Amino acid sequence: MTDQGIVKINASLRKNVGTGPSRALRLSGEIPAVIYGKGRDSLSISLSNREFVSKYRSAALSTHLIELEIDNKKEYVLMRDVQKHPVTDRIQHVDFQFIDYGTEIKIEVPLIFTNEQKCIGIKRGGVLNILHRTLSIKCSPKAILQNIEIDLSGLTTGHSIHVSDLKLPPEVNVTMKEHNPAIVTISSASTEKEAESNQESTSTTPSSES
């Protein structure tokens, strides 16, 4: 296993759980967290607020394999949930999932759209419609994708890029419910105006009384 795409974070086991101990942890500059997974007992841990927030802001942790060093023992996990304070937006709790290298995992991968300024359809007055900003995939932990780039430069008016048009590694499988959905389209400006006009006329048409 290589270090490519792996984010390393230090952690410590915590014996005391519950509202009181968790509040005390936060006051001391720590974040309470838990690791869970099928067939394994959950682990209650704590993270350095400074270290975790720094890496949380600099990397898309939800699509990175994370190496937690817990009191000199390594565990490989995925971040599954981050709970934040509703007012201060400070991180209150983090959920991780144990990773088994022999089992495929499901994740949502961000889609990155490039060359919008070079897009033929937009240059000709077309309107860009992004229908999906993430892609649901299933793959081994070693094949996790941090993002998927989609080149818009060759997209013309009236055409779309579908899931089947993406060049994905053979070990990555798409798990979206809809079969081969369009991800992005370029429609003509007149089509957009007509659609808006139809919506306005529908919303302003009085309903008939019985």
Swiss-Prot record:
* Region annotated Disordered, chain positions: 186-210
Mention any one GO cellular component term assigned to this protein in its UniProt record: cytosolic large ribosomal subunit
Pfam short name (any one): Ribosomal_L25p
> Which residue pairs form cystines in this protein?
none
Q: Name one GO biological process term.
A: translation
- What keywords tag this UniProt record? Ribonucleoprotein, Ribosomal protein, RNA-binding, rRNA-binding
InterPro entries in the record: Rbsml_bL25/Gln-tRNA_synth_N (IPR020056), Ribosomal_bL25/Gln-tRNA_synth (IPR011035), Ribosomal_bL25_b-dom (IPR020057), Ribosomal_bL25_C (IPR037121), Ribosomal_bL25_long (IPR001021), Ribosomal_L25_dom (IPR029751), Ribosomal_uL5_bac-type (IPR020930)
Q: Name the domain of life.
A: Bacteria
Q: Which GO terms describe its molecular function?
A: 5S rRNA binding; structural constituent of ribosome
* Bias-annotated ranges (Low complexity): 198-210
* Record family assignment: Belongs to the bacterial ribosomal protein bL25 family. CTC subfamily.
NCBIfam families linked to this entry: bL25_bact_ctc, PRK05618.1-2, PRK05943.1
HAMAP family noted in UniProt:
Ribosomal_bL25_CTC
Instruction: Spell out the subunit comment.
Output: Part of the 50S ribosomal subunit; part of the 5S rRNA/L5/L18/L25 subcomplex. Contacts the 5S rRNA. Binds to the 5S rRNA independently of L5 and L18.
Q: What does this protein do?
A: This is one of the proteins that binds to the 5S RNA in the ribosome where it forms part of the central protuberance.
* Protein name (Swiss-Prot/TrEMBL): Large ribosomal subunit protein bL25
